[in-house]
UniProtKB/Swiss-Prot annotation:
Region Disordered, residue ranges: 29-80, 121-391, 517-548
Skewed-composition ranges (Low complexity): 40-52, 145-160
Species: Mus musculus
Upregulating conditions: By PPARGC1A, PPARGC1B, ESRRA, ESRRB and ESRRG.
Name the UniProt record assigns to this protein: PGC-1 and ERR-induced regulator in muscle protein 1
One GO BP annotation of this record: regulation of DNA-templated transcription
Amino acid sequence: MDNFQYSVQLSDREWAEFSATADECGLLQADLASGDEPLSSDIDQGDSSGSSPPGPPPLFTGQLVSQGRGQQSRELEDVAAQQLVSRSQCEPVLALEASHQVAGTSTQSEAPLFPSLDSVCPGQALSFPGPATCRDKMQRLLQGPAPSSPSKAPHSPESPGHSDNPQSSPDSLEASPRNPGRKKRRAVGAKGTKHSGSLDSAATQMSSPQLTRPKEALMSGTLMAKAQQDKPQPDSTSPEQMAREESGLDLSTPILITEQDQIRKTSRAALHVVSKPVQEVHPDVPMASPNVSTRASKPQPDVALPKPASKPQSDIASSTHPFTPDVSLSTLAFKCQPNTNQSTPASEPDMALSTPASEPDTALSTPASEPDTALSTPASEPDTALSTPASRSQLVKAEFASACTPGLHVDLSAAGSEIKPEVSSSMPAAVDVLRTDLPRSVSKTESKESVSIPVKPSLSPISQAEAAMVDTGVSVPPGGSIEKPAGQFSAGSSGESCLGPVQAPKKKKVRFSMAIPSHEDSGSGEPTGSPFLTPEQPPVPRTAAGSRGGSAAWDAVAVAPRLPQPRILKHLPPPVSSVSAEAESGNCFAVTLPEAYEFFFCDTIEEEDEDVEDEEAASQALDEVQWPDTCEFFFRDSRAQRSRCQRGHSPVSPPRADTVAPVPPEGLVPISIPEVYEHFFTEEGFGHRQPAATPMQTSELSREGGLEASTKPVSPTAEHLSLTVRKAGELRSPLTSFTFSQNDMCLVFVAFATWAVRTSDLQAPDAWKTVLLANIGTISAIRYFRRQVGRGHSGRPRSSSSSNPSC
């Protein structure tokens, strides 16, 4: 009754619009409540991640199903449910629905609508499987219409859409046999493996009418290809894809490498037969290769072009990681290489099986010998013994594969241009020159040589050392084979057997010349030998245990640049000679400040009377040299007055002095100047001391006899005494005057030093000069005062100098 009543009151279009609107309102409210609003990325891709929980089933549609409708009403409900789920997930795509179509819409206009609707949204509808009712609905939708639906096509305008809908949905789901793993993965991510089984069965049932709609298949295939490019999962291995999701893309797991091998085996035939670019034939490999190397974050950013980086990983007969990290950084590559080579020993035969369609027979032997080389190298020396050979072989192998692969030569040559600067930054210069100078065909022999010789890793220190010394560029014909890498000894000279005929280099250029001859002096490439090797270590052939002869040669070469060291030693003797000169000369003033002060200002305090005269004479000479103008300015008049007074007392003294001159030296020479001052210059004055000298002169004259003689020489004695005092005064007057001035100057200098230190900025950079001068002057003044106090003559010279002008 209910079904009949609704079918009478509502037409098919009105019923579809009503059910879609009612269910849409319910589902949108549920989406808003649960926070599962569709993202813009999901809408653009026409696909969903399958991680959001399914919405609640439409209640009104469920009631209609439980009431048992007819076949036509169930089809209408399925269409409405399909539109509802699709519109709730990708609403901008499904703006055109049944209610917005014009009555005159033809089959061609409605046919692309539902295929596009189904090709975009079945993934979303399948990503949100609900209870058993929704799953049964989807299954009925995929199985096809009832026999009554084609008969009703001419009666209702929407029947072409309904009749096209079952045909369009298999076409929209044609990616299921082509890509069953993706559907299964989404089903597993949403509900589990049981839904994926139902989807696979449905896809298998509808596999027959897939090719009926080529245009719609092209649209759906384009959308699926876009989804595949956005999602980096491969096409052919669904169990490994689920394992990849669970394992988190670990680099060291063998599942990942096996998966790559399976990708190669499945896509190798289409790739090389059709000769299309890699990203067109199977676009998921370029996206999967970054996922493979996501753990090693540095190698991928270093390779600037994603296409050359992904093509060697999909086509070259070597593992993915040994190529890409070795291109970018050799040091980082060898941290990654042991993991990849040791964890995937079984993947090498798979890659070798995938190469015969495109690569010559020489490349088939490369993977067989490569694991021996990579696994035989000790892991304890990843930077020195492993860096140069492994990266060299892998890079050359990459270039060789680029020359052999049909569609990849240009891109890999572009990749090689980017690769070479990065390799040259972490490898010897000779390896870089070898890469740039060799033709492409020559790299084939080098790859075969560098891989099949197991002793290559142990020889890398020699190549690095000699490459640091000499940078050579080798030009080899395309058909010939090359010798060892640049800078090493040739195989003919070292005794090592080579895979191909060894050809001597024809052109070699020397970066810098040294005093010791090098390999470039001989045209055959053999070392001239004796300067490089010490006598204890003759040249020996290289072996797997390592070549001590080559290392000794490098040691000898490393010592060679130290020949200019005698030049440095030539500069060392002058400090030694200066030190010895300082040790020999005790009066050197350039060593320390106290010695400098002792040299300039020091007169040691000596209490012995024997040295006083010499000290006073030295000080007098020093004073006359240092202060001549001062003495002449202050004390010239006093000396002139003194000389006039003495000349007034004895006007005839000069001729008498000549006659009596030989007598005084005997008694006056041993007398010091202070004693002369004490004897002659007292507080009483010069005239009071004159009778004291008379008995001395009388005793001298009494020895000659005669009273007349004693009375006559009185005047000569007085004149002699005046002459002696005058000479003493003339000799002492500069010293007396300077002694006075030196005391005053010392006091003035001490005051000046105190003022300078107090008023200057001691934080300035030049404050040390002021402090140094003030300290030196003050210390000299203090020492002078101490010397004067020790003698006890500080006050008398001043009084005598004041008494002289009074005469």
